[in-house]
């Protein structure tokens, strides 16, 4: 293994595993080694103690994504001990900084050390292959095949500063507030990508509910708490998240700013930007704070077949389905190198577990039985892909 330090205390760990057929394109198997902070006072356990309770491992990173990192390491440790060679070359990549925009992790590696990934055409990583129980107990395994893009923008309204006791028809804060309220209340049109259509057809088939391509929203209730995340993938979105204006109660500020978290579907970035502009009008400026691409790849081919076959070999009643993720992963950075990525970190979950709420949540935890299932499925996949 080799360590690539992009900045002080920002390390990326890369290892190469030679396959039995080195003429085949390589596979990147990657995870991130950072986690978001945790306020210990909010937790029922020490968030960094990895306590085992009620058949689960509790702690920050248990689902995002130390669980996957641990599965990967368990598999390659077994290979090292037995001398096993996978069918193709594998690049193991453990990135820094995924939770902070990937700047010193996958983005830095792709920009500064693309040679690390030379010969690789495909990748797998987090947030995919987890089970969602629907209908009369059928399990759908959600494999990530698409991701929304990001456009964080700062809106600024300028006006006439003055004394708070005076009338002011050029109040920047008033203008900004009206614009922010319009954005927050805007009803974005439903737009369904190919990945979303495939997913909802599978949901309809598994539950026996009608499939109406004109309005997929009625099917959301069939997937329980997962609907919160999947519902966000049926349209673009823009949420006001921060406000900044003024410095004293009796001073009308000359400017006021707000931050908007915009998310766009694959192929619909222009629509997001044009809609925001039309909502707020011409007098408020827009500054890009951060932008990242959207992704969508085909849910077909040998790699997808290998993922699906690995799932059904270990859960014959399981139904692999593609889904569009409302957030993003390090696969976005690797896509800039032409690498096609999927979210495949299999977990068989209890039907009543609100899995999505655990990401960055209080009392984050992962079922040990899910990990045991996942490591077997992941090993099966890696040994047959």
Show where each model-derived region lies.
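Metal-dependent amide/peptide-bond hydrolase catalytic core
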Residues: 129-379, 383
């Amino acid at each position: 293994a080799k360590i690539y330090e992009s900045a002080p205390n920002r390390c990326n760990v890369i290892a190469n595993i030679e396959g039995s057929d080195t003429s085949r394109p390589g596979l990147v198997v990657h995870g991130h080694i950072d986690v978001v902070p945790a306020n210990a006072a909010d937790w029922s356990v020490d968030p960094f103690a990895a306590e085992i309770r009620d058949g689960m491992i509790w702690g920050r990173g248990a689902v995002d994504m130390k669980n996957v990192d641990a599965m990967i390491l368990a598999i390659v440790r077994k290979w090292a001990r037995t001398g096993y060679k996978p069918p193709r070359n594998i690049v193991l990549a453990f990135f820094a900084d995924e939770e902070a925009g990937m700047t010193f992790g996958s983005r830095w590696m792709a920009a500064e050390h693309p040679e690390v990934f030379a010969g690789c055409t495909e990748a797998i990583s987090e947030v995919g292959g987890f089970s969602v129980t629907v209908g009369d107990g059928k399990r759908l395994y959600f494999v990530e095949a698409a991701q929304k893009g990001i456009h964080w923008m700062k809106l600024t309204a300028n006006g006439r500063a003055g004394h708070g006791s005076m009338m002011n028809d050029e109040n920047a804060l008033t203008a900004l507030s009206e614009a922010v309220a319009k954005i927050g209340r805007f009803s974005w049109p439903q737009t369904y990508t190919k990945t979303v259509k495939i997913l909802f057809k599978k949901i309809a088939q598994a539950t026996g509910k009608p499939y109406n391509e004109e309005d997929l929203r009625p099917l959301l209730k069939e997937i329980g708490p997962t609907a919160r995340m999947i519902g966000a993938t049926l349209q673009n979105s823009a949420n006001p998240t921060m406000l900044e204006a003024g410095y004293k109660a009796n001073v009308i500020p000359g400017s006021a700013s707000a931050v908007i978290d915009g998310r766009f579907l694959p192929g619909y970035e222009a629509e997001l930007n044009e809609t925001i502009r039309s909502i707020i009008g011409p007098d408020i400026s827009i500054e890009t704070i951060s932008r990242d691409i959207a992704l969508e790849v085909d849910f077909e081919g040998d790699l997808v077949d290998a993922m699906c076959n690995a799932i059904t070999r270990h859960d014959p009643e399981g139904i692999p389905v593609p889904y569009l993720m409302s957030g993003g992963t390090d696969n976005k950075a690797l896509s800039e190198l032409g690498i096609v990525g999927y979210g495949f970190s299999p977990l068989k979950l209890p039907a009543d577990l609100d899995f999505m709420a655990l990401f960055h949540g209080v009392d984050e935890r992962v079922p040990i039985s899910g990990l045991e299932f996942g490591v077997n499925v992941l090993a099966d996949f890696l040994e047959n892909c």
